[in-house]
Amino acid sequence: MILVINSGSSSIKFKLFDTSKAIEPILDGLAERIGIDGFLKFEHNNQKYKFEDPLPDHEHAIQLILNKLLELKIISNIDEIKGVGFRVVHGGEISHSSIINEEVLQKIQESVKLAPLHNPAAIIAIKAVKKLMPNTSMIACFDTAFHQTMPQVNYLYSVPYKWYEEFGVRKYGFHGISYEYIVNKCEEILNKKKEHLNLIVCHLGNGASISCIKDGKSYDTSMGLTPLAGLMMGTRSGDIDVSICEYVAKQTNSDIFAITQILNKQSGLLGLSQTSADMRDVLEQYDRNDKKAIIAVEKYVQVVADFIVKYANYLDSIDAVVFTAGIGENADVIRDLICKRVKLLGLQIDQEKNESKYSDYKLISSEKSKIPVYAIRTNEEKMICLDTLNLIK
């Protein structure tokens, strides 16, 4: 069995995979409000469990998870868990999932300055598992690793080169675990080896990015040094004129940190619509002809369409355009509006297919479309499980 952990500052999402046959999760859970007034909940064999517990820290939460797995006889002993895979948001210039040793842990620590909200939580969880399961292999899967194949012309910024040399200022990109899963899935769907696949993948969730996949590898992506760059998102602004920060700071007697917080937490869909960061709420207002919701949706759609056209220019041919993540998988209206804005590529959506229910993936383009368009459900936890399994063999 493989345990997959995604650790946040006050929560731990986890899945337990049985890898003896098909690689499918047998348990899906969440430890939440760690350090406040916590609880643990999970689902196993269609039965839901919830346990109230103070959860003073991550180590206590992981200990409780393991205790409940044993108490409920989901596992008979800890050694049944052959590996633990961790999602780590930032790996700097690490280019692949890695067995966690002191060197890798140090590199994760060095990347804290690039992901101060995310990496510390991963480090805490890794150290807790190491203490509680000292004989179990641990693997770090990085959201940034997939994008390490980008050429320098795409990852360097036009700023003093010494900023890159001294401070690591460059585009890193994110959602790499999701993109890797989608590339593997497209290899299966399109029956074409991934080293020959050219894709434009739109990962549209509350955080959103697009990646240009050339010969199965990341060639460019919309997020940058941090996840703030690129597309308009739920609460993030995406790309803006950076001098806005200084201008608004002066106008409001704020500092750059305060303005950056606003760009991260109060912008995007929330900022423009003044309604919500959730696309479902914004679309409700859009249907009611709310002017701010309309401009928010139109801006969101336009920015995605612009990136699709930009990335199409990098590719000699395109095997598919893919929509994934919460909005990409579920918001048929947004998929349709985006494809209608991409005038140069001849994308044609079949409305019936686009609106139909599906489990894993579906083709949503019509026969007239010059390029196939798919909605594919991403599965980052399964990708982490597969990487963990491959590395511990």
UniProtKB/Swiss-Prot annotation:
PROSITE patterns: ACETATE_KINASE_1, ACETATE_KINASE_2. It comes from the Bacteria. Its EC number is 2.7.2.1. Catalyzes the formation of acetyl phosphate from acetate and ATP. Can also catalyze the reverse reaction. Homodimer. Belongs to the acetokinase family. This is Acetate kinase. It comes from Mycoplasma capricolum subsp. capricolum (strain California kid / ATCC 27343 / NCTC 10154). The gene is ackA.
